[in-house]
């Protein structure tokens, strides 16, 4: 299920656009996640009280968390599938401390794709979208495998 060198190049090229505005992209991804899947808010004590997209947009904590999420994901993507060292602590914290189900990782992957389509439609054609979808699926599958090792049924 790995990606070709060409697919990784597509992923990292579009990710460069994300890194040019981590705060904006991160905020948009989390707002999309929380509005499309409100049940995900229950996992975030800091954000549970945010009920509207406008409230979310005004939250500095949400913006900071968006940067944290996309910074971690960017570090994983740059490893081009050789991300064992990055995945292990992330899976550990998301399984044991935060108890984030794999389904929610699918939801945030959908949110990332949606935001990239909206912000970079000219640079996010079917080839780039397909490569990014594969990269995010690889990430989710590897997190799910670690969850299983940890005995987390997320």
UniProtKB/Swiss-Prot annotation:
Enzyme class: oxidoreductase
Sites where the protein binds nitrite: 65
Source organism (scientific name): Otolemur crassicaudatus (Brown greater galago)
Reactions catalysed, as given in the entry: Fe(III)-heme b-[protein] + nitric oxide + H2O = Fe(II)-heme b-[protein] + nitrite + 2 H(+); H2O2 + AH2 = A + 2 H2O
Chief site of localization: cytoplasm
Residues that bear Phosphoserine: 4
GO cellular component: extracellular exosome; sarcoplasm
Phosphothreonine carried by residues: 68
EC number per UniProt: 1.7.-.-, 1.11.1.-
Protein name from the UniProt record: Myoglobin
